[in-house]
């Protein structure tokens, strides 16, 4: 890592296999979300660090856990609908990033997948989501983009 890279930050996340993407899209459709996250953008964040770390992404396809429940994350006046994941794998990879010196902007890490970035005043849907298997195809990293908008 070069000294000039330190202020770039590190973003690390996972992408899902087709069966997992199909399941998330089916949830979006059943809930009739107004502006769902597109299939190619569905992911789960591992690390959102304002400092660059030497994170090494894993590239193997594997099951990493299961869906747990729906929740709304309120942030910057928006109400994002997420599926919380029961994933010791994601928790351990987040801890790996912390050991490498990653920063984190929130008090706790909650593995999740965002289904819609803003559901407005919509109530949390009552659909059961517990226990669906979640399989990733790979992890990836990129420089942190502090200007990113959904």
Curated annotation (Swiss-Prot):
Keyword RNA-binding applies: no
Q: Name one GO molecular function term.
A: hydrolase activity
Give binding positions for 3',3'-cUAMP. 11, 73, 142, 148
Which source organism? Acinetobacter phage Ac42 (Acinetobacter phage 42)
Catalytic reaction(s) noted: 3',3'-cUAMP + H2O = U[3'-5']pAp[3'] + H(+); 3',3',3'-c-tri-AMP + H2O = A[3'-5']pA[3'-5']pAp[3'] + H(+); 3',3',3'-cAAG + H2O = G[3'-5']pA[3'-5']pAp[3'] + H(+); 3',3',3'-cAAG + H2O = A[3'-5']pG[3'-5']pAp[3'] + H(+)
Q: Where does the chain bind 3',3'-cGAMP?
A: 11, 73, 142, 148
Pfam families hit by this protein: Acb1 (PF23474)
This protein is called Anti-CBASS protein Acb1
Active-site residues are 43, 45, 112, 114
Write out the coiled-coil annotation as residue ranges.
none
* Annotated family: Belongs to the anti-CBASS protein Acb1 family.
Primary gene name: 57B
Q: Which GO terms describe its biological process?
A: symbiont-mediated suppression of host innate immune response
UniProt keywords, alphabetically: Host-virus interaction, Hydrolase, Inhibition of host innate immune response by virus, Viral immunoevasion
Q: Which domain of life is it from?
A: Viruses
Give the protein's biological function.
Counteracts the host CBASS antiviral defense system. Phosphodiesterase that enables metal-independent hydrolysis of the host cyclic di- and trinucleotide CBASS signals such as 3'3'-cGAMP, 3'3'cUA, and 3'3'3'-cAAA. Does not cleave cGG or cA4. Besides evasion of the CBASS system, might also enable evasion of the type III CRISPR systems that use cA3 signals.
């Amino acid at each position: 890592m070069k000294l000039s890279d330190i202020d770039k930050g590190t973003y690390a996340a996972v992408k899902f296999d087709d069966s997992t993407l199909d399941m998330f899209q089916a949830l979006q459709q059943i809930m009739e979300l107004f502006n769902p996250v597109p299939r190619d953008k569905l992911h789960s964040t591992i690390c959102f660090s304002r400092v660059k770390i030497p994170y090494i992404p894993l590239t193997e396809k594997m099951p990493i856990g299961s869906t747990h429940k729906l929740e709304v994350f309120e942030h910057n006046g928006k109400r994002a609908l997420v599926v919380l994941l029961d994933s010791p794998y994601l928790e351990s990879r987040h801890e790996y990033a912390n050991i490498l010196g990653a920063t984190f902007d929130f008090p706790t890490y909650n593995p999740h997948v965002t289904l819609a970035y803003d559901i407005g005043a919509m109530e949390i849907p009552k659909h059961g989501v517990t226990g669906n298997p979640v399989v990733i195809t790979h992890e990836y990293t990129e420089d942190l983009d502090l200007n990113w908008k959904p």
